From Swiss-Prot:
Domain of life per record: Eukaryota
UniProt biased composition (Polar residues): 59-75
Binding site for UDP-alpha-D-galactose: 147-151, 186-188, 214-215, 275, 308-310
The enzyme's E.C. designation: 2.4.1.-, 2.4.1.38, 2.4.1.22, 2.4.1.90
Protein name: Beta-1,4-galactosyltransferase 2
One Gene Ontology MF term: metal ion binding
Record: glycosylation sites: 63, 68, 354
Positions on the Cytoplasmic side per record topology: 1-15
Pfam families linked to this entry: Glyco_transf_7C, Glyco_transf_7N
Gene assigned in the entry: B4GALT2
Family, per entry: Belongs to the glycosyltransferase 7 family.
Topology in the lipid bilayer: Single-pass type II membrane protein
Recorded catalytic activity of this chain's protein: D-glucose + UDP-alpha-D-galactose = lactose + UDP + H(+); an N-acetyl-beta-D-glucosaminyl derivative + UDP-alpha-D-galactose = a beta-D-galactosyl-(1->4)-N-acetyl-beta-D-glucosaminyl derivative + UDP + H(+); N-acetyl-D-glucosamine + UDP-alpha-D-galactose = beta-D-galactosyl-(1->4)-N-acetyl-D-glucosamine + UDP + H(+)
Disulfide bonds: 94-136, 208-227
């Protein structure tokens, strides 16, 4: 009996031992399987986000790197590869009333005026007579157009006084001297038309055009060379006329039109050869298109004229009075749309751009441009 009981206990102990061994093996297998899963998880996390330990996690509604950053597929923010550099300073717009104006300026034409001196006085002016103020952004880009022939002496004085004045006015501008080639009869208005087109060829952003005789110098820098809602007449009080407007419709000397205003009147007439008449024709064009003349205060719009004799081949135009009477008809076909000329040379000088052109002669269409 005892022998039978001992055999039974031995078999039970062996069975328990086998069960314990089986349980141990199952536990070991499960342990290594869980360990492998954890190792794979942390390996993937380390590859995707190597810099995670250096940057704290951000909430889903906040991005601390840059406004356009996006979250990764794991829900964690992506770390930028490089931080953005400093932004360029914003240049403010130029004020309506420039702070550096001096008002009335003493003008004299007795001292010698070499171009080298004028160039030294205006170091900020770039080749071709271009200037942009460094401390503000102007609202307009201004082209100053000068009809010209054989007036080098006058031009030096004009540049001497005008460059500093235009810089004080905080203008972005360029100076264009339109030089009529040859000795045919002078045609001021046609040269101004040429200047309008040639300036736009160089810089299509020009939106204001100042047309100035080379012998007229403003006496007050508060006479701002800008364009407004209406065509502007600047030279309203010349010493030549006793500092008074000679007549109500006078539009001579120095005037300004925006690009849109100039095109609205079909530019200036091309058929006024010789002295006189074209200014009155331009006034008629402005009136006929429903615009009005804007002028500065008479105390500000004062000018000095450099005295000179009448130019050869610029005699008074005997047809000017009859032409003025027909502006309503002639402005439709005579103007910027019918302009013909030929550019002979473009020379960019330190203080201005010289454009020499062949504009033909009276009753001639030989200049095909």
């Amino acid at each position: 009996m005892s022998r039978l009981l001992g055999g039974t206990l031995e078999r039970v102990c062996k069975a328990v031992l086998l069960l314990c061994l089986l349980h141990f093996l199952v536990a070991v297998i499960l342990y290594f399987d869980v360990y492998a899963q954890h190792l794979a998880f942390f390996s993937r996390f380390s590859i995707r986000s190597p810099a995670h330990a250096l940057y704290p996690a951000a909430s889903s509604s906040t991005n601390c790197s840059r406004p356009n950053a996006t979250a990764s597929s794991s829900g964690l923010p992506e770390v930028p590869s490089a931080r953005p550099g400093p932004t360029a300073p914003v240049i403010p717009p130029c004020p309506d009333v420039p702070p550096g104006l001096v008002g009335r300026v003493v003008i004299e034409f007795t001292s010698p005026m070499p171009l080298e001196r004028v160039q030294r006085e205006n170091p900020g002016v770039l080749l071709g007579g271009r200037y942009t103020p460094p401390d503000c952004t102007p609202a307009q880009t201004v082209a100053v157009i000068i009809p010209f022939r054989h007036r080098e002496h006058h031009l030096r004085y004009w540049l001497h006084y005008l460059h500093p004045m235009l810089r004080r006015q905080r203008l972005r501008y360029g100076i264009y001297v339109i030089n009529q080639h040859g000795e045919e009869t002078f045609n001021r208005a046609k040269l101004l038309n040429v200047g309008f087109l040639e300036a736009l060829k160089e810089d299509a952003t020009y939106d204001c055009f100042i047309f100035s005789d080379v012998d007229l110098v403003p006496m007050d820098d508060r006479n701002l060379y800008r364009c407004g809602d209406q065509p502007r007449h600047f030279a309203i009080a010349m010493d030549k006329f006793g500092f008074r407007l000679p007549y109500a419709s006078y539009f001579g000397g120095v005037s300004g039109l925006s690009k849109a205003q100039f095109l609205r009147i079909n530019g200036f007439p091309n058929e006024y050869w010789g002295w006189g008449g074209e200014d009155d024709d331009i006034f008629n064009r402005i009136s006929l298109t429903g615009m009005k003349i804007s002028r500065p205060d008479v105390r500000i719009g004062r000018y000095r004229m450099i005295k000179h004799d009448r130019d050869k081949h610029n005699e008074p135009n005997p047809q000017r009075f009859s032409k003025i009477q027909n502006t309503k008809l002639s402005m439709k076909w005579d103007g910027i749309g019918s302009l013909r000329y030929r550019v002979l040379e473009v020379s960019r000088q330190p203080l201005f751009t010289n454009i020499t052109v062949d504009i033909g002669r009276p009753m001639s269409w030989l200049n095909q441009g």
